C-alpha cells in the first residue's frame, strides 16, 4: 500500500471484561466471558460480545485451544447505521516455559470473522488472520502480584483483500493481582498500530479484566 494514499488516524479505546473459568481437570478447562469496548477516546460504545473458549494441555506446558465470539458491533458511519451482528471463531497453540519467577509464553492463533446475514457478494469478505504472540511474565513471590509484557504481530490471509500480509502489531503491558476466594483482577495498557494498509490507524488501549475460576477436580 503506498503511503501517499494512507490515512493516519489515532484513538484511545477502553476495554473491559468479566470471565468465569471452569477447570474440569488439570488438563481441560472452559471459560465464558462478557466484553465491552469503547472508542473515540472512550466516549462511544464500539462493540460488546460474548466469548466461549476451551483449552486442553496435550503435554506439559503445551496447550491446544479454541473459541467462538458472538459480537454486536456499533456501526455509526455511512448511510446505514446501527448494531451489526458478527461471528468469530479461533484456534490456537500455546506454549509456556517457566524460569523460577519468570515465564516465557508463546501463542499462534488463527481467527476468522464475518458479519452474519450477508453474502460475500455484498462485500462481506471474512477477516482472516494468523496472529503470532510472545511475552514475558514475572510473579512477585507470595503476593499474588504479577506483570506481563506481550508483543503480537498480525498476518492477514484472506486472498480477496488487497491488504494481505503482515499489517498490524500490538504491544501490551499488564499488571494483575490474584485474591484468595475472590479471583483475579488485571489492568493493562496496549498500543496497536497498522502498517502496509490504506488506513494507518493507531490506538492506545486502556483495559480492566476480572476472572474467577472454579476447580472441579
Where are these regions (language model features)?
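Residues that define the transmembrane beta-barrel architecture of outer-membrane proteins
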Residues: 12-14, 46-48, 85-89, 124-130, ...
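Outer-membrane beta-barrel transmembrane domain signature
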Residues: 103, 107-184, 190-192
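Repeated loop/turn-to-beta-strand initiation elements of outer-membrane beta-barrel proteins
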Residues: 26-32, 61-66, 100-104, 142-147, ...
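Start-of-domain marker
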Residues: 7-67, 71-74
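Residues on the lipid-exposed face of transmembrane beta-strands in outer-membrane beta-barrel proteins
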Residues: 18-22, 52-56, 91-95, 110, ...
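Transmembrane beta-strands of outer-membrane beta-barrel pores
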Residues: 34-40, 68-74, 97-99, 110-114, ...
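Bacterial Sec-dependent N-terminal signal peptides
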Residues: 1-12, 214-216
Amino acid at each position: 500500500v503506498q503511503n501517499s494514499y494512507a490515512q493516519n488516524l489515532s484513538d484511545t479505546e477502553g476495554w473491559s471484561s468479566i470471565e468465569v473459568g471452569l477447570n474440569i481437570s488439570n488438563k481441560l478447562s472452559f471459560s465464558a466471558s462478557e466484553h465491552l469496548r469503547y472508542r473515540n477516546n472512550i466516549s462511544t460504545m464500539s462493540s460488546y460480545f460474548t466469548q466461549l473458549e476451551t483449552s486442553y494441555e496435550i503435554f506439559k506446558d503445551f496447550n491446544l485451544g479454541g473459541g467462538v465470539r458472538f459480537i454486536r458491533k456499533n456501526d455509526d458511519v455511512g448511510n446505514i447505521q446501527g448494531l451489526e451482528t458478527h461471528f468469530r471463531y479461533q484456534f490456537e497453540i500455546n506454549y509456556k516455559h517457566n524460569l523460577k519467577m519468570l515465564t516465557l509464553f508463546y501463542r499462534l492463533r488463527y481467527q476468522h470473522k464475518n458479519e452474519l446475514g450477508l453474502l460475500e457478494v455484498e462485500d462481506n469478505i471474512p477477516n482472516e488472520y494468523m496472529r503470532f504472540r510472545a511475552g514475558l511474565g514475572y510473579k512477585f513471590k507470595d503476593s499474588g502480584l504479577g506483570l506481563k509484557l506481550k508483543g503480537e504481530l498480525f498476518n492477514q490471509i484472506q486472498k480477496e483483500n488487497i491488504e494481505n500480509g503482515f499489517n498490524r502489531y500490538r504491544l501490551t503491558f499488564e499488571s494483575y493481582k490474584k485474591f484468595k476466594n475472590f479471583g483475579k483482577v488485571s489492568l493493562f495498557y496496549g498500543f496497536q498500530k497498522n502498517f502496509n494498509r490504506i488506513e494507518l490507524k493507531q490506538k492506545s488501549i486502556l483495559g480492566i479484566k476480572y476472572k474467577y475460576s472454579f476447580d472441579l477436580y
